[in-house]
C-alpha cells in the first residue's frame, strides 16, 4: 500500500481545502485468501468529519466498501458508488453518525468480484476539522417501540424491505410507509445490508406513522448467502473468515439478542447479477425460518418460490422446526 499525505496551508497550492488533510491510499487487492481486507489510517485529535472516496479501478471488478473506527463498525456501504462520510451529527447513507475518535481507523474492502487481475484499489481519505454535511436532526438513538396495540389478531407485514440505507435501494422510510399503508400492511421490517444505520431514523418515522410498526433488522449479506436477522438491533459482523466470524457465531449472536435468523432467497443463483444470493453456507443450529417468497408472486413468481419451498421442506424433513 502506498500512502501520500496532502496538507492544506496558505503557502501550498494543493487539492485540499482549508482545514483538510488528504490521505491518498492505493495498492493491490490481495490475491486469494479471505473475502475482506483492511486499509488502516490514523485520525488525529480535532477531526470532526471523515470522507472516504473509493475506486475499484476496473470496469469488471467489483469491490465493496465499509468503515471501522477504533471501536469497530461505523458503516457498510457495500457497492455504494458515492463516498462514505461520517461526522458528529450526520453521515452519508449506510453509515453511522457519532464522535470521531482519534486513533487507528480502517477502510474495509470486500472482494465481491475479481476477474480483471491483478486487481487494485484507490482511496482518498479526507480528514476535516469542520463538517460539510447538513445537520440530520431526524437521527436519534434507537429505542424499541411499544407496539401497535389492538390485541391478538393477524397482522400483515413485509419481512424483507430495503431503505435508502442499502446501496441497492432508494426510498426513505416515509416512502416505504406510504406504500405499506396503501397495501394494508401493519408492519415492515427494514433489513438493510450489513448495517443498522436505518435504526437512527426509526424514532422520527415511527412518530410520523404511529399506525405502522417499523421492525428493526438487517440482511446479513455474504458472498455465499444472505440471511435476514428479523428484530436485530445490534450489529453482527458479516466478514466470514475473520477471527471468530462464522455463520454459526453470527446466528448465535442474533439469537442472543432475540432476533430470528432466516435464510433469504436460498435458491436464487443468478451469478454476478446477484452476488452471493443463493445459500451455500452450512445451516446453523439457530436457523428459525426460510424466506420462500421474494419480490411477490406477480414479479418473481414460481421461478423463485418452488425451489425455496423445496429447500425449506428438505430442512423440515431433517427434523428442523422452521
What are these regions (language model features)?
Residues 4-14:
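Bacterial N-terminal signal peptides
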Residues 20-32, 56-92:
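Surface-exposed beta-strand/loop patches in noncatalytic accessory domains
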Residues 17-47, 134-156, 164-166, 178:
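Non-catalytic extracellular/lumenal accessory regions of secreted precursors
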Residues 43-45, 54-58, 111:
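Non-cytosolic beta-sheet module surface loops
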Residues 140-286, 291-320:
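A metal-dependent hydrolase metal-coordination microenvironment
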Residues 69-73, 129, 233:
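Solvent-exposed strand-loop boundary residues in beta-sheet-rich modules
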Amino acid at each position: 500500500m502506498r500512502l501520500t499525505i496532502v496538507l492544506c496551508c496558505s503557502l501550498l497550492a494543493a487539492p485540499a481545502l482549508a482545514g483538510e488533510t488528504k490521505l491518498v491510499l492505493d495498492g493491490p487487492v490481495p490475491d486469494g485468501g479471505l473475502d475482506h481486507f483492511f486499509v488502516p489510517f490514523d485520525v488525529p485529535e480535532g477531526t470532526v468529519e471523515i470522507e472516504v472516496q473509493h475506486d475499484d479501478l476496473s470496469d469488471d471488478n467489483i469491490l465493496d466498501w465499509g468503515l471501522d473506527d477504533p471501536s469497530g463498525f461505523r458503516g457498510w456501504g457495500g457497492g455504494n458508488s458515492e463516498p462514505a462520510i461520517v461526522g458528529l451529527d450526520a453521515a452519508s447513507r449506510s453509515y453511522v453518525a457519532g464522535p470521531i475518535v482519534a486513533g487507528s481507523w480502517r477502510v474495509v474492502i470486500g472482494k465481491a468480484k475479481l476477474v480483471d487481475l491483478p486487481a487494485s484499489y484507490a482511496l482518498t481519505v479526507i480528514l476535516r476539522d469542520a463538517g460539510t454535511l447538513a445537520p440530520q436532526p431526524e437521527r436519534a438513538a434507537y429505542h424499541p417501540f411499544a407496539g401497535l396495540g389492538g390485541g391478538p389478531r393477524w397482522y400483515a407485514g413485509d419481512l424483507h424491505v430495503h431503505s435508502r440505507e442499502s446501496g441497492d435501494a432508494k426510498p426513505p422510510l416515509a416512502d416505504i410507509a406510504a406504500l405499506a399503508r396503501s397495501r394494508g400492511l401493519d408492519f415492515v421490517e427494514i433489513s438493510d445490508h450489513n448495517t443498522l444505520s436505518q435504526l437512527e431514523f426509526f424514532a422520527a418515522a415511527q412518530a410520523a406513522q404511529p399506525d405502522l410498526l417499523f421492525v428493526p433488522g438487517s440482511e446479513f449479506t455474504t458472498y455465499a448467502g444472505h440471511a435476514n436477522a428479523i428484530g436485530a438491533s445490534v450489529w453482527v459482523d458479516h466478514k466470514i473468515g475473520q477471527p471468530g466470524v462464522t455463520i454459526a457465531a453470527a446466528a448465535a449472536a442474533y439469537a442472543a439478542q432475540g432476533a430470528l435468523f432466516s435464510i433469504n432467497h436460498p435458491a436464487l443463483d443468478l451469478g454476478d447479477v446477484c452476488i452471493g444470493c443463493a445459500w451455500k453456507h452450512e445451516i446453523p443450529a439457530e436457523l428459525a425460518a426460510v424466506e420462500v417468497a421474494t419480490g411477490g408472486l406477480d414479479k418473481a413468481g414460481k421461478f423463485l418460490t418452488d425451489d425455496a419451498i423445496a429447500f425449506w421442506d428438505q430442512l423440515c424433513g431433517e427434523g428442523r422446526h422452521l
